[in-house]
Design a protein with these regions (language model features):
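Mobile late-domain/C-terminal helix-loop "cap" segments
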Residues: 291-375
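Glycine-rich phosphate-binding loop
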Residues: 61-83, 205, 211-269, 350-354
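Buried hydrophobic positions in well-ordered alpha/beta secondary-structure cores of metabolic enzymes
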Residues: 12-15, 68, 129, 171, ...
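N-terminal glycine-rich phosphate/adenylate-binding segment common to multiple enzyme folds
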Residues: 50-154, 241-243
């Protein structure tokens, strides 16, 4: 029997609850499709940081490295300075495990209403592929004369051909299994050096994919076109900063951050990829059972796809979508069940759901990611 070893980082706030709910769906998929899941819990997050003063140590990195994938719930705690856990733990793992490609689906599922008029499941199914380790997020820079009227801040942005090529190549391979339309999003009329490097890489990689159409949209224009005409896009490839911003915009279009999943992908398979819902730790509702585990379940579906378990991924995605369509509210006390109960409903639905009811499985993101899974 195929066995996948998952490292589980529940994290902070609602993170442990939504992760536990998502794992119920993963285990149901394993039972249905004949593979096994073994999990190891890791105590990383605010409590561990407050005890040790370290967000991520080398021993934890090496222990995590021995797993096939990492499931992360959420991090963030009012007792910890904002950014410490996000940079120290999440960005730290992305860099340590060469998770150079971030995958953010923007899909409106049947029964979920978008806040944007005219958006429907028929015209909202795109993927944002974001370079995950470079750009302005490398952290380089300095500030001179802080706290004075003469303060000057310099923030460095680094863009390299190898990292950009790896991201663009991944995007072309993915879009080849979908509708074969790739869009580069940048701001090359202003960020002329980095923007031109991105365009050069896209043009070069495109020569190897003659059946894929590709175009370009400025980042500011994308903020107009994506919400008003999401059906125009199939796969959007972009840099770290623009990808971070656009994927949150996309989450709004698809019904909110509470439904948004993500994958931090190591495309070469040299270290585990990491899967996490986009939402935060929501410490104000932690322990109340008001958090919707759908984004965590959908992230777990991405994890199964990344492990090559296409059928399990499709079933978990379809089960989460099916349960979402039945909820009287997408979060809070009016959701129609607490976090664990919604998780159980998703897991129960996995056992007999038909993925074709939410779209063509052959053109789905789950199928595309499973085909790209390192062997």
């Amino acid at each position: 029997m195929r066995t996948h070893h998952l490292a589980v980082i529940g994290g902070d706030g609602i993170g442990p609850d939504v992760t536990a709910a998502a794992l119920a769906g993963v285990r149901a998929a394993a039972d249905r499709y004949g593979f096994a899941i073994e999990t190891t819990e890791f105590d990383l997050g605010a409590e561990a940081y407050l005890r040790s003063g370290v967000a991520l140590d080398e021993a934890s990195i090496e222990a995590l490295r021995r797993h096939d994938a990492v499931l992360l719930g959420a991090v963030g705690d009012p007792r910890v300075t904002p950014g410490v856990l996000e940079r120290g733990l999440i960005v730290g793992l992305r860099v340590a495990f060469a998770q150079s490609v971030n995958v953010r689906p923007v899909r409106l599922y049947p029964g979920v209403e978008s806040p944007v008029a005219g958006v429907s499941p028929d015209n909202c199914d795109l993927v944002i592929i974001r370079e995950n380790t470079e750009g302005l997020y490398t952290g380089g820079g300095s500030i001179s004369h802080p706290g004075t009227p003469n303060a000057v801040a310099i923030q460095n942005s680094i863009t390299t051909v190898p990292a950009t090529t790896e991201t663009v190549e991944f995007a072309f391979r993915l879009v080849s299994a979908r509708r074969k339309r790739l869009t580069l999003c940048h701001k090359k009329n202003i960020l002329v050096h980095a923007g031109q490097l991105w365009q050069d890489v896209v043009d070069e990689v495109a020569t190897r994919y003659p059946d894929v159409e590709h175009d370009y949209v400025h980042a500011d224009a994308m903020c107009l076109h994506l919400p008003l005409d999401p059906g125009r896009f199939d796969v959007v490839v972009t840099d770290n900063l623009f990808g971070d911003i656009l994927s949150d915009l996309g989450a709004t279009v698809q019904g909110g951050l509470g439904l948004a999943a993500s994958a931090n992908n190591n495309p070469r398979g040299t270290a585990p990829s990491m899967y996490e819902p986009v939402h935060g730790s929501a410490p104000d509702i932690a322990g109340k059972g008001w958090a919707n585990p759908a984004a965590a379940a959908l992230s777990a579906a991405l994890c199964l796809a990344g492990l090559g378990e296409r059928d399990g991924a499709l079933a978990l995605e379809a089960a989460a979508a099916s349960v979402l369509a039945e909820l009287p509210a997408l979060a809070g006390p009016g959701m129609g069940g607490d976090t664990a109960e919604i998780g159980r409903r998703i897991a129960d639905r996995v056992t007999d759901v038909d993925p074709a009811k939410i779209g063509d499985p052959e053109r789905s993101l789950m199928t595309g990611l499973a085909r790209l899974a390192p062997r």
